[in-house]
Amino acid sequence: MIKVGIIGSTGYAGQELVRILLQHKEVSIVWYGSKSYIDKKYSEVFQNMFQIVEESCFDDNMEELARHVDVIFTATPQGFCASVMTEDILSKVKVIDLSADYRIKDVKTYEEWYGIKHNSPDFLKEAVYGLCEFNREDIKKARLIANPGCYPTCSILSIYPLIKEGIIETDSIIIDAKSGVSGAGRGAKVDNLYCEVNENMKAYGVSTHRHTPEIEEQFSLITLENVTINFTPHLVPMNRGILITAYGKLKKRVSYEEVKEIYDRYYEKEYFVRVLEKGMPPETRWVEGSNFVDVNFVIDNRTNRIIMMGAMDNLVKGAAGQAVQNMNLMFGLPEQEGLKLVPMFP
């Protein structure tokens, strides 16, 4: 059995890790880390775990944890993992970081967008960007995984085949994104109170959202060009889910059949990416609670643009599910182990 420790197990992504890993045949969770609930029973924090998890929460001591487990998941705010990472830790244990600390390779870019100093830049080169559909072989050999952000995961998977094939102009990409409130985390914030978000939609982080450089860096690596995008996220009054609607200018006229063949070719062997049939726009309700990403597209010949769409659960494929997918690859397990979660409806 793989011994797992979770730092930040009482956040939304951390709790989702617990839910998924409890169903995993090859895993034993031995450390429920939480600086907010030290010594409190996990099931007292999340009553859905009553009579399922009887263990208590430990502190977030990563050095101590590395002595007891095979892999550590850090479901923590930006800055934590980078502040405690050492070669000694990585020599003992694999680490999957769900924060942004190792996603962006350029230290200056990270510090500029996140507004904090990066405390372990020496590990940036080694860290593997954990988008399994593209970096599978590197993930298998990795000690340190940078689990991708939720918006970048949905955006990249929705757009990747067409940007890779040179179908769209790389300087024309506009991404309109919408997310449920769980994407903002479990911490108490006035902006996330019920009366603030109910019956309301709003754009936020307009032109300044931190996931922008992550998406741009990945597209730049794909195209070997300096790609700049317009990315605007919106908060919508639902618990979970992400919906992406992206726009790109076509380099030439293409038919529906040509584009559909490209998507099918890229994703036919990818269990978790579902290319929908013509006229079926992705919806968040059809992926809720699952590790699936549903993608589709529409060609608008009138404007010479293509509209690319994607939907996924921000806490599963956008966080915990993708992290478990990475763990499976790192330990030579079937990639779908513990992740064949049927979407919940209604």
Swiss-Prot record:
Subcellular location: Cytoplasm
EC number in record: 1.2.1.38
Pathway in which the depicted protein is active: Amino-acid biosynthesis; L-arginine biosynthesis; N(2)-acetyl-L-ornithine from L-glutamate: step 3/4
Predominant location: cytoplasm
InterPro entries: AGPR_AS, AGPR_type-1, NAD(P)-bd_dom_sf, NAGSA_dehydrogenase, Semialdehyde_DH_NAD-bd
Top-level taxon of the source organism: Bacteria
CDD domains: AGPR_1_C (cd23934), AGPR_1_N (cd17895)
GO molecular function list: N-acetyl-gamma-glutamyl-phosphate reductase activity; NAD binding; NADP+ binding
Active-site residues from the entry: 150
Enzyme class, UniProt record, top EC level: oxidoreductase
Record keywords, A-Z: Amino-acid biosynthesis, Arginine biosynthesis, Cytoplasm, NADP, Oxidoreductase
Reaction(s) this enzyme catalyzes, per UniProt: N-acetyl-L-glutamate 5-semialdehyde + phosphate + NADP(+) = N-acetyl-L-glutamyl 5-phosphate + NADPH + H(+)
GO biological process: L-arginine biosynthetic process
GO CC aspect terms: cytoplasm
HAMAP family (UniProt xref): ArgC_type1
Family to which the UniProt record says this protein belongs: Belongs to the NAGSA dehydrogenase family. Type 1 subfamily.
Summary of the function given for this chain in its UniProt record: Catalyzes the NADPH-dependent reduction of N-acetyl-5-glutamyl phosphate to yield N-acetyl-L-glutamate 5-semialdehyde.
Name recorded for this polypeptide: N-acetyl-gamma-glutamyl-phosphate reductase
Organism expressing this protein natively: Lachnoclostridium phytofermentans (strain ATCC 700394 / DSM 18823 / ISDg) (Clostridium phytofermentans)
